[in-house]
């Protein structure tokens, strides 16, 4: 009987250890997901701040970039119209 009781206690301790290990793994995974979610939210807020910053949009480089892109798009549109009429 003593041998059986020892075996049962060993099996119980092994089972409880495995349960504790699995709970730790689950908790670590949940913490990792929460941390990734927090980092994603922080990154989204950084991009929002850049997009909504009026000083950045009114800077000379942004104005020049907008003008250059506008000129390129107009020239491209004129070429498309010219070659479509030419055929």
Curated annotation (Swiss-Prot):
GO terms for cellular component: membrane
Cell location: Membrane
Keywords recorded for this protein, A-Z: Membrane, Transmembrane, Transmembrane helix
Superkingdom in the source lineage: Eukaryota
Transmembrane helix recorded as keyword: yes
Membrane topology: Single-pass membrane protein
Protein name per the record: Putative uncharacterized protein DDB_G0287489
